[in-house]
Amino acid sequence: MLLTRQYIDKAFWKKLIAIGVPVSLQSMLFSLLGAIDIFMVSQLGEAATAAVGVGNRIFFFNLAVVFGLCGAVTVLASQYYGSGNLSGIRRTLAQSWFISLVVTLPFIWLYVVYDKEIVSFMADDPEYVGYAREYLVVTGLSLLGTAVVVPIESVLRSVGEAKMPTYVSIAAIVVNVFLNAVLIFGLLGFPQWGVFGAAVGTFISRFFQTGVLVYFFCRRYSHLLPTLSDWREGTVKKYRNKYFKVSMPMLIHDALWTGGLIVYSIIYGQLGVTELAIISFLSPIEGVLISTFMGFAVAASVLLGNDIGAQQYDRVEKTAWWYVLTSAVLATILFFAVWICSPLILNLLEKSPLTDKQMALNVCLVLALGMILRVFNMVGIGGVLKSGADIRYSIFIDTFGQWAIGIPLTYYTGMVLGLPLHWVLMSLLVEELVKGILTTHRIQSKRWINNMVDDDTSVTA
C-alpha cells in the first residue's frame, strides 16, 4: 500500500503543481465568488441570502450533471493523451459538447417555466420565493455557457494545460464581482436591483468566460478542435458505447449526489429560514476551504489516467495512496487552524446579518471537522477511482452513503428529534465515515485500475 520514493521525483512534483495548483486556485476562486455573492446579498436580509443560496445549489446540480456527462472527457482524454492518441481526444470532445447541450436545454426550459414550483420546494416564505424566482430564471439561462465551457476545461486539463482555464476564470470572477457590486447596490449610476442584480451579473460573467475561453482554445489548441470526421466518428457504435460506458454512470453518480444536496437543502428549509440562511451563508466558505484540495483530486485523476494509458501500473498502485493520504493530512491541519481561530470567526459573524451567531459558529466548526473525511473521499473517489474508470463502484459508495445513511439521518435528527442545526450536520459525518471505509477497501483491492484505451490505435494527428 505504501509507495516507494522512486516515483515522487522532480518530474512528478512539476506535473502535480502544473495541474493541481491552477485547478485548486480556480476552484477556490469559484467558491470565493459564491461567498462574495452571499455576503453582498446578505445585506438585504435572511430571505435574500436563502434565495441566492438555493439558486446556487440548483446551479451546482446542473454543473454536476454537465461534469458527469463530461467525466468521460477527463477519463478517456487523459488515457488517450498518455497513449499518444490525439484523434481520440478530439472525438471525445465532440461527443461531450453534443451531449452536454442536449441535456442542458430541457433544464433551462424547466427553470424558466416552472421557477415558482421549483423554489417553493425548499421553503414557502413569500419573500424568499420572490427573490429565488428572479434569481433562478436569469442564472438558469447561463447554463448554456456552462455546457460549452466544461468540456473544453476537461480536455485542457487532460493534456496538462490547467493554466488557461484558471486565468479565464479569474477574469470572469473579477467581472462578476464588479457587476454584482454595481447592480446589487446601484453603484456608478446603475439601478439598484438587489437579488436580480446579482443574477444579471452572474449571467454576464458566465458568457464572458465562455467567449474568452473558446477564443483562446481555438487560437492555441486548434489541433484539439474536432474535425468533421471526428464528429462522425463520435457517432460510430464502438466509440459511442465507449463514451457512454464511462459518462452515463458518472452522470447518474453526479446527478444522484447533487440531487441529495438539494434534498438536504429542502430539509434545512423546513427547519426554518434562519437555518437555511446559515447554511447558505457558510456553505460557500466551506467550499473555499475544500476547493484548496480540488487540485489533488483533478491531478490524481489526470496523472493516474496518463499512467494507466501508458500501462505503468506499478506506478499507479503506489502513487494513488500518496494523493489520498497527503490531502487528508493537510485537511486535518486546516481543521485545527479553523478551531484555533474560532474566536475571530465569531467576531466576524457578529458583523453578519445572521440572527443566531452562536449556531452559525457551531455549524462552521462542524463543517471544518467534516472536511477531513470529505477531502479523503473527494480525492479517493473523484481522483483515484475516477482515473481508472471505476465509475460503478464510485456510484455505489456515494449513493449508498448519501441516500441510505446521510439523508435518513438528517431527516431523523432534524425533523423528528428537532435537534439544532449543528447536531444535524454532525450526524452527516457518519455518512462520510462509511464512504471513507468503502473507498479505502476499494483502493486496496486494485480492482479500480481499468485501461479504457488499450484497444485503440495510436494516432498523433
Where are the regions that the model predicts?
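Short alpha-helical transmembrane segments in multi-pass integral membrane proteins
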Residues: 1-20, 77-144, 191-247, 304-370, ...
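Transmembrane helical elements of multi-pass membrane transporters/channels
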Residues: 18-37, 138, 149, 172, ...
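Transmembrane alpha-helix boundary and packing residues in multipass membrane permease domains
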Residues: 23, 27, 38-39, 75, ...
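Generic alpha-helical transmembrane segments of integral inner-membrane proteins
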Residues: 24, 28, 32, 36, ...
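Helix-terminus/linker motif at the lipid-water interface of multi-pass membrane proteins
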Residues: 28, 32-50, 119-126, 182-193, ...
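Small-residue-rich hydrophobic transmembrane alpha-helices
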Residues: 38, 49-109, 146-165, 276-342, ...
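Short runs within selected transmembrane alpha-helices of multi-pass transporters and secretion channels
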Residues: 70, 139-158, 165-173, 198-213, ...
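Short loop-to-helix capping motifs
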Residues: 125, 161-162, 272, 390-391, ...
